[in-house]
Design a protein with these regions (language model features):
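Extended non-catalytic accessory segments flanking core domains
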Residues: 1-236, 245-258
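Proline-aspartate-enriched helix->loop->beta-strand connector
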Residues: 261-262
Length: 262
């Protein structure tokens, strides 16, 4: 409808089997409009392909946005970010393939301002308005292989670091798990902007300080069956879900510690 506050796209949920569709197809959909965990979708009873070979021009979107609900107007649409975006967070990259992108680097508000202060609140809001989550287009947990945001496999020859940049990020705006996110339709242009130092600057000292965050490394298994732990045996166990997952975690941690060579 070309109204700026409503989306020109919508997600289609179809449980009636597979439909032979491709990018550029024109389809006719019959179904019921619904909200699924905050995502507007059509629960389709029928999907028919009417034509093919159509082109869709992605809508340009930039960060920061004006409001926390600004991406609602692009939900289900193919969009592109013409600006360079910074890789600001990747805590969920290994488990869910998620990377948080911003237009500039943001300090943790409490590292700069007094908690609860006006300045703190302004900085926290500025970050929320300046971020979008880049997903990997998959729903798997602990995906193997992981995908680099450039679309290729993530490995030791194709890495990224916080502070590196992406250009021409293009995909469909999605909403799930309380986040607006981009489901990419193509790899972004990767720019190495924050290379890892070969070694720390010389400070004249003789001591080395090393650390390793092992995250949820427990020898107990959270397998949903025998996962009763704690001093009083009243808590669920923490750690990997299976022995195979634990062995994978163990091997990765040992290799990382050895590579540090403290």
């Amino acid at each position: 409808d070309d109204y700026p506050y409503t989306s020109e796209g919508v997600y289609i949920y179809y449980s009636g089997g597979t439909v032979d569709v491709a990018t550029g197809d024109e389809v006719r959909v019959r179904g019921t409009v619904s909200e699924y965990n905050g995502l507007t979708e059509i629960n389709a009873s029928q999907v028919l392909v009417c034509d093919s070979g159509k082109t869709v021009t992605p809508t340009a979107v930039t960060l920061p946005v004006d409001s926390l609900t600004a991406f609602e107007a692009y939900e289900g649409m193919l969009v592109t970010f013409p600006q360079e975006l910074i890789i600001s967070e990747y805590f969920n990259f290994d488990q869910f393939g998620e990377i948080v992108l911003t237009s500039e680097r943001h300090m943790t508000p409490t590292a700069v301002y007094e908690p609860g202060s006006t300045e703190y609140q302004a900085a926290a809001l500025a970050y929320q308005l300046d971020k979008i989550t880049l997903d990997d287009g998959r729903s798997a947990s602990n995906p193997d292989p992981a995908l680099h945001p450039n679309g290729a496999v993530f490995n030791m020859d194709n890495l990224f670091r916080g502070g590196d940049k992406l250009a021409n990020v293009t995909g469909v705006i999605d909403y799930s798990f309380n986040l607006y996110r981009i489901q990419p339709t193509e790899g972004a242009d990767y720019i190495s902007a924050n290379p890892r130092p070969a070694e720390p600057e010389e400070v004249g000292g003789t001591l080395k300080v090393v650390s390793m965050n092992t995250l949820n490394y427990f020898t107990t298994l959270d397998d949903g069956v025998n996962d009763i732990c704690g001093p009083d045996q009243l808590q669920e166990c923490r750690g990997a879900d299976t022995l195979e997952e634990f062995n994978r975690q163990h091997a990765k941690l040992v290799a990382a510690i050895v590579e540090m060579d403290p």
